[in-house]
Amino acid sequence: MMKLYNFSVLWLLLLPLAFTSFVHANEAIVNLHLASPSNTDTPRNHYIHALLTLAFAEQGKQVDFIYSIRPMNKKRVVEELSKASSINLAWLSLPANSYPDLHHTSLSIYQGLHGKPLLIINKNQQPRFAEISTSAQLKPLIALQKQSWSDYDVLIRNGFTVNGELDYKGMTRALETGLADYFPRSVSAIAAEVTKLQHQNLMIEQTIMLQYPSHYYFYTHKQNDALLMELEAGLLKLQKNGKFAQLYQQFFGEKERDLALSSRKVFHLN
């Protein structure tokens, strides 16, 4: 009986310590609820995963990535993020002060890279594009872009002709059949995309780069400011110790060199 009593007392003494350890373990894990990409062919963003993992590690945290069951386009992502319910973080390029309930980090995730799209074209059309020397010559040609994508608004605002009604497969078919002329795509993804599309007689146009101000930040609802502050602190540490720049070069440095960005004709948009 005495042994049972002693064991009970010991358990009561250890219980708070065990509970405290459990709480501290849970506090060291950050659950990030993210949106699954609307294009099911798009792989998970390894750069974003690596950046978030490093940033929270600087704060002594581990990250658990939890993706939504249903895919979301940009419009849906903003809507869900504004509800502060299903997702709690997204990386977006949004007009300044357009969503007062959403707060964002201060450092540009891609260092403006998404504002330098290249063009996917039909291989037979490269000589035609090589002769284009001004944006005015490009504007009458039919560009492809989904209306929910940020490039669509930029192209329309700058007077380009854009078909925004097709899904991704429809766009690539339109290029192949000559119903459209070019498909602006991010430097970060265009090479991988064209590799997948090689059976469709498509290529990366070799001479032109569009450029406009575009900066992606991590956004969350203002109710999640504690999460955002933790992430911001981690990102600033990465910037200070050079790991941010190192990670960017690891993922995009070679792509920038291989795509010869510095030697292309640049058409500046606003």
What are these regions (language model features)?
Residues Y67, P71-N88, R157, K169-A189:
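Short helices/loops that flank or line small-molecule/ion binding pockets
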Residues S36, L113-L118, T195-E232, E254-N270:
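Periplasmic-binding protein-like
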Residues K146-R157, L235-N270:
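Ligand-binding clefts/hinges and TM-proximal coupling segments of bilobed small-molecule sensing domains
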Residues T53-A57, N124-Q125, H215-K255:
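Extended ligand-binding regions for polar small-molecule ligands
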Residues A28-N45, A130-S148, D181-Y182:
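Short loop->beta-strand "edge-of-pocket" segments that line small-molecule binding or catalytic clefts
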Residues S82, L89-D101, Y182-M209:
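A ligand-binding cleft/hinge motif common to bilobed small-molecule-binding domains
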Residues Y110-D153:
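A conserved helix-loop-strand patch within extracytoplasmic ligand-binding domains
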Residues N26-D101, L231:
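Extracytoplasmic small-molecule ligand-binding "clamshell" domains
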